[in-house]
Amino acid sequence: MTGRASIVRAEPGFSLPFFDRLAPAPPPTLVVSRIEAHSSAGDIVLDLHGRGGWIAHAALDRQRGAVSLESSPLTRLLAELVLRPPDLRHLDAAFQAMAASPRRQSSLRIAIGDPFATRCATCERMLVADEFIWAHPSDAGEADLAGSRKHYRCPVCRTQRGGAEQRTGAIDEEDLRRARTEPEDNSQVRDRLRDRFPVVDGGDRLVDELLDLHTPRQLAGLEAILDRIEGDLRAAPVEAALRLAFLHALLPSSRLNGFPGRMSTLRIQAGHVRPPGAGQWRERNPWLSFEDGIRLVRGFIQRLEGGSLGSVQARLGNDLRSVADGTATAVLGVIGPAAARTLSLGGDGGGAGGHGRVRLALGQPPVRPNQERLSLAYWATAWVLGREAAAILPIDALSGSAIRAPWGWQAAALSRSLRAAQPAIARD
């Protein structure tokens, strides 16, 4: 006699590293088994609290239509990549074009790396440092500039002397001078970035504290990368991949990147950022962090194409009617009143007998909110997607004390979502 499959033993899903804590992916085998058991080809599957389009991805792979109401704008961005992964050749071409795009008197990559110029401790050749190791300030002075060492790559020393390509050297006076020097347009850069953050009640200094998590030269580099991502015209899947790569460059290019050890946790409470703990931190070149993000996203797409569910290319529509009666195969949205109205209008357009309506509502309960998740979501959404997307989040909770969601919060959220989606769900 065959035993029943256990949810606990189901193989966990995979996602990008940033979303492992914010919105973990569901087990793919469990999702597929539920879709196969409770729906048939041509039916529409609804995910009320999506975590990156994984339910919709599995539904499309099984010849179903899909409606995914994502839990946040960031998971909506991830779902764009999951449901319509770009061609890797197009992504590589877009990244190379960004690196070679003009920036002042040189290219974007060179302009971002110039403030991180240093000398090799062995051959004294000029090169671009990977990162500097600094100490956190103990007071309001310049103690954070008392760096301990720098990491860089010198191909000449590796060829002539051997050893590892990445080398370590002591901080010299020229490095300290460059670290103290602010870019000429530092105030303009901060103003443009400040406009991306919605204001939290009681947090007049919150946005400046968030920007202070990055050094002036890191801010200039990140703003230059973001300006190029948003300024160029390219396909939506490629732009989504570039934004997700930029998302994974934010934490490594901040004071939260501790040394040694793991990333510190961003926590906003009572309208202020809790400062990182004492110790050392890495000031990493933002372009190198962006390159690491591109490699992460590229590997994610390769794994997506070679996974058990295979690669799908969804045709996105605006509402449920476009899936039921049109040529679209999926609808993406963010959970909220507007999404509920779209579902209700789409459900009214179904034919007799419930044809064209949602046959299966499948998904995970919403992730319980806490201070760390909301702080990270607010900070990252404002950086990656801008002010309007970040304003959707319940940011008013950041101005008060620690968030303590009651135990019945998930059940209440599911109940509200199911009531809103009831007109679109077909009867058994």
Model regions and ranges:
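Soluble or luminal CAZymes and related metallo-dependent hydrolases
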Residues: 26-27, 409, 413
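Nucleic-acid modification enzymes, centered on SAM-dependent nucleic-acid methyltransferases
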Residues: 2-51, 55-56, 60-359, 366-403, ...
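A short glycine-rich, Lys/Arg-flanked "PGG" loop and its adjoining helix->strand segment in the class I
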Residues: 355, 411-427
